[in-house]
Amino acid sequence: MKINKNNYFKIIIFIIYVIINLINASDNVKLSNCGQARAEPTFKQSENGGQCQLPPPSIGTAALSLSAFNGGARCGQCYELTGPLGKTVVMVTDGCNSGEACTQKDLFNFIISNKDFDKIGNSSSYVNIYSLGYQEVSCGFLGNIKIKFGGSLGHNGKVDYSYYFTVSFSNFNIGIKQVQILGTGMVSYMKLKRSLGGFTWNQESGGSKLQFPATLVLTGVDGQIISYKFRQPPANIAIDMKKQFIPQVGLLSSKFNQSEICGMGNVPEYIYEDSLTFGWIVSNSWRFNVFNLSSQDTDDNPTLGESVIKMDLAANGGLAFTREGGFQTKYLESLKVMIKVLPPTNSLQCFFGASGIYVIPGPLGGDWQEISIPISVLKPQKVEYSLSFYNNQGQSITMWIDNIKWIFSPEAPPTPLIITDPTVTPPPLPQSIVTAAAGVVGLNSIGITSNKGGVANLVDGSSNDDDGTGGTGGGASNKVGKRVDGEDGDNFMGGNNAFSYYNDDNSSNILLFSFNITLTFLLLSLIINILLLLF
């Protein structure tokens, strides 16, 4: 049978569509830049789909802190989490609302299973990762989006969608930002109200009742738009939509560099400044007699704050600052400390981990002095868990210490420590904190506190819009959504603003990205050759 040229073009387009779907569906394509959050493990998994009421996915699940969960707005979204031991991808299926970690509004808190936690950390050694790196990614599910309808029972005992109906989705690769409907006889699309993991429509006073056929329009968090035309559907049955969000990567438009790999979050600039910053503990210190974390022995020194640490260290005793879940040392250049010691000593050591050999140059005496320790002399591992000051002599000393501060390398990102929503753009930063050394905020036991320079806190930059536009999150412009099915997207806007945090080295992911680019170019080359043969 002879195939005409039009059929050749249809075959080529079909091949392109299939290959792009296979490439992108199997990858976790980046949908945001990197942020920092916190993670904790749990033995109890969400049952019955959690608050999102989603079917159990093929990947791990997560419950988000109350403000991050945002009333279910992040149901079904997937995130790649980075800890000291590796990475894992989880899908949001639930929220949590009890306990400080769940109710604070300053940072994302991921509650994940012990199994998933142990892919990135060690649940038998610590129960938090305070410097968690995270990034929204496509879920990598195969197949199409599934849709399920529900309505009210009519007088005949059958489901009636005329005045009220619900709709829920599953197996979507990109989070759903909003859903709109246009029924027969309606003059314009109507936005459905989100109800945790589902969406609800009610006939408005004086409005038209829902008549079929109708069209649903789904807008993804990346601005993509899918339309679904349907006649009256059966209730409570999962229906294959025959469509899927396609992550935009390769030759398709993507505002996120797929070769940039997120690492763990940076530590706060200060370990101690009047108080311990968020995530640091001193309970692993040893052989001491007096330990005061808020001593007033400042000697009216103008370079000190209101409080200092005072510690009577016995012979071979140590002050240990420990951070659960570890911290990366990649961007640490030096450590600065204000310190005085009585009696004077030449035997105070500083090291990462359990032991070390670096001796702080002395003598350290009864006058306050600032010391600077190059991180390189401490022989750091890629990820460390503690920093200690050790009295390596046979007699006791009294040590006062304050303003324990990291100095970051020029390559360190000049952004705030906490990015609670990496898909939006934050307010402009004060000029005083643009440098790497000053661009990290201090934290208290709950979350963010402002540093001396001041940092604008960003909890959620998305707007609760009713017109189909995306959250500006500080003024960045929105972009017109792109329909997957090829229809015009003139009346639908998808906000997808973001900003950079930091990168880490990951050659395997870079190779995977390079492979996808290479495959895309090979595909184009094949198409060009076919066209040359045809013409």
Curated annotation (Swiss-Prot):
Underlying gene? expl9
Q: How does the protein associate with the membrane?
A: Single-pass type I membrane protein
Q: Which domain of life is it from?
A: Eukaryota
User: Signal sequence: where?
Assistant: 1-25
> What protein name is recorded for this chain?
Expansin-like protein 9
The chain's Extracellular topological domains, given as residue ranges, are: 26-514
- Any single Gene Ontology cellular-component annotation: membrane
Q: Which residues are glycosylated?
A: N24, N122, N257, N292, N506
Where is the segment annotated Disordered?
A: 459-487
Q: Give the transmembrane region(s).
A: 515-535
Give every Expansin-like EG45 domain span: 31-144
* Keywords associated with the record: Disulfide bond, Glycoprotein, Membrane, Signal, Transmembrane, Transmembrane helix
Known InterPro entries for this protein? Expansin/allergen_DPBB_dom, Expansin_CellWall, RlpA-like_sf
Location comes to:
Membrane
Q: List the disulfide bonds.
A: C34-C75, C78-C139
Which family does the entry's similarity section mention? Belongs to the expansin family. Expansin A subfamily.
What's the stated role of this polypeptide? May serve to lubricate the movement of the cellulose microfibrils during cell growth and wall extension and/or may serve to maintain the fluid state of the slug cell wall.
